A protein has these predicted regions:
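Conserved P-loop NTPase
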Residues: 94-97, 105-138
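Gly/Ser/Thr-rich loop/hinge elements
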Residues: 13-65, 92-98, 113
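Short, well-structured beta-strand/strand-turn elements
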Residues: 77-90
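Single conserved hydrophobic/aromatic residue that forms the stacking wall/gate
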Residues: 1-9
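Short beta-strands and strand-coil junctions in structured, solvent-facing domains, enriched
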Residues: 11, 64-66, 81, 114-115, ...
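Intrinsically disordered, Ser/Thr/Pro/Gly-rich linkers and terminal tails that flank
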Residues: 12-19, 26, 116-122, 130, ...
Length: 166
């Protein structure tokens, strides 16, 4: 589930996201970054653990950064169904640089692109199945599984895919 994951981009978050995707994707590109000079850094998968079961990923407008790397790869490879609403659209890599006086500056150092080369910055990723969260649930602190119409739609999709496979 990448729904609600905000802008927590750090090197270890990218690495963790890529490690998760290496357990799912076929051989190929996971994501790549490109700096202002066009220098490209690729993150790849050997395909040794390709996931072959039904998969649904919940996304929304708070799904950003590493959550979009994950969702973008799943969508580009077609190995799962994105359910929910359009993601945030944060396709940049930022670094925080500490200054001598104790302050810090946040610098954008590169952009990232999905395996198909899609630039999602300020655009987001559209889900395969759009499901708005019920209005009555938007301000609730806790939402049960039974109430969560986006989750219920994802479960329904997985059940349909499972039945089709049998």
């Amino acid at each position: 589930m990448s729904r609600g994951l905000g802008d927590v981009y750090k090197r270890q978050v990218l690495d963790t996201c890529c490690e998760m995707l290496k357990q799912m994707l076929p051989k190929g590109l996971i994501v790549y970054t490109e700096d202002k000079y066009g220098q490209r850094t690729e993150y790849t998968c050997d395909g040794n653990n390709e996931f072959k079961k039904p998969l649904a990923v919940l996304v929304n407008g708070y799904s950003a950064s590493a959550a979009e790397i994950f969702s973008g790869a799943i969508k580009d490879y077609g190995i799962g169904t994105l359910v929910g609403t359009k993601t945030y659209g944060k396709g940049i890599v930022q670094r925080i640089v500490g200054m001598e006086d104790g302050t810090a500056v946040k610098l954008t150092v590169s952009k990232y692109f999905t395996p198909n080369g899609t630039d999602i910055h300020k655009k987001g990723i559209e889900p395969d199945v759009t499901v708005e969260l019920d209005e009555s649930l938007k301000n609730k602190v806790t939402v049960t599984e039974e109430e969560d119409n986006q989750l219920q739609k994802a479960i329904s999709i997985l059940q349909e895919e499972k039945n089709d496979a049998e």
